Structures are given as structure tokens and as C-alpha cells.
A protein has these predicted regions:
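Short helix-loop-beta connector
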Residues: 105-108
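Conserved hydrolase catalytic core segment
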Residues: 124-134
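The feature captures the conserved acid-bearing segment of alpha/beta-hydrolase catalytic domains
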Residues: 141-184
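Short beta-strand immediately N-terminal to the catalytic nucleophile in serine-hydrolase-like folds
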Residues: 111-114, 138
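The conserved beta1-alpha1 loop
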Residues: 26-30, 139, 165
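Gly/Ala-rich beta-loop-alpha elbow adjacent to hydrolase catalytic centers
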Residues: 113-118, 122
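Serine-hydrolase catalytic machinery in alpha/beta-hydrolase-like enzymes
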Residues: 9-12, 20-103
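Short, hydrophobic/aromatic-rich segments at coil-to-beta transitions
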Residues: 1-5
């Protein structure tokens, strides 16, 4: 299925799927993920469910997807803690725009997914909004400083949560990131 690019809040969002969807799927993306997006959507299409999928670019990966500020754990770039702004963009601009452009049933099931820091964002967003029926977090950055303490005090509101972890993440030489295996 080919993508349609829709400008939402000056961001070029890639939209796949159809109106009257049973599922409304969102994924915050970085440049590194766009090349594999068509394959991901092809796998989703095999479910034979009606869906509308929006790939939403994160303007600054470390800043836009981190729930609070934190120092760099590798390299020099820290984390800006702007996840609340990203969630607000999703709920106040992206969802209303898609509802305006595509007729969707009132009971459409909304699922938020992401990989790495976008996976952490999806988990965090589920603690902030009772909007998502499901969360899909692939190799989420649950090593993020303070995440485990936060998660214990703020339960997720999604009905379903999918977590996966690759073979290499917990074996990295970076001690902070290696905690992902214990934290997932």
C-alpha cells in the first residue's frame, strides 16, 4: 500500500490505510525508520483488519520523545524532556486532522507504537492519557534515567501492551543502556 504524505503542524506525516478503519495506529519515527516503513505497513496489512496508520516524524529524537530532561548516556546530546509537547501534538493536531480527513467510527481502537526512544514515549504516553487501547514498544528505552521509579508510581492505562527486546541491547558495554534487559 502506498503512502500519502499529509502536512500536519508543518510535519510531513506518512499516512497509510483507509477510512472507516477499525484501528488507528500511530508511530513516532526518525529518519532511520522511514526506509523500512513500507515493509512494516505490508505486515500490518496481512492482518486483514481495516486500519489507518500514521508515521509521525519526531522533530528532535532525544528531545521530543523523552519524558523529562536527562543527561547524555552516550555522545554529547542529552534529553530535552519534551514528550508532553509531542503527546499534545498527537492528541490536539494529528488525531483531529485525521478524524477530519478520514471518516472513523466512534469506537476506533487507537494504538501507539514505537522503537527505542519512541517505544519509551509510547509507554510513557499510556501513563498520561486514557486514549490508547494498545501500546507496542519494540526495544523501548526503559533504561532511561528514572523510568523504573516513574513507571511504578504511574500505571499504564492501555488495555494491552506489547514489549519486545532484541538480542544485543542488554549486552552493550554502556552500563546505563544495559539495564534494559532487567527493566523490560
Amino acid at each position: 500500500m502506498s503512502a500519502q504524505t499529509m502536512l500536519i503542524g508543518n510535519r510531513p506525516c506518512r499516512i497509510y490505510g483507509e477510512a472507516h478503519a477499525e484501528y488507528l495506529l500511530f508511530q513516532m519515527t526518525g529518519e532511520h525508520e522511514l526506509q523500512s516503513m513500507d515493509d512494516e505497513v505490508a505486515a500490518i496489512a496481512q492482518s486483514n483488519r481495516k486500519y489507518l496508520f500514521a508515521a509521525i516524524p519526531a522533530e528532535s529524537w532525544n528531545d521530543a520523545l523523552s519524558p523529562w530532561e536527562a543527561p547524555a548516556v552516550w555522545g554529547k546530546q542529552g534529553f530535552g524532556g519534551n514528550a508532553a509537547d509531542t503527546l499534545r501534538f498527537l492528541t490536539e493536531q494529528v488525531i483531529p486532522t485525521l478524524e477530519q480527513q478520514y471518516p472513523l467510527p466512534e469506537n476506533v481502537k487507537i494504538i501507539l507504537g514505537g522503537y527505542s526512544l519512541a517505544g519509551l514515549f509510547a509507554l510513557w504516553a499510556s501513563t498520561q492519557a486514557n486514549l490508547f487501547c494498545g501500546i507496542a514498544a519494540a526495544s523501548p528505552s526503559v533504561w532511561f534515567p528514572g523510568w523504573m521509579e516513574f513507571e511504578q508510581r504511574h500505571p499504564m492505562q492501555a488495555q494491552r501492551v506489547y514489549l519486545s527486546l532484541g538480542d544485543k541491547e542488554e549486552h552493550t558495554k554502556n552500563a546505563v543502556m544495559a539495564a534494559v534487559g532487567d527493566n523490560i
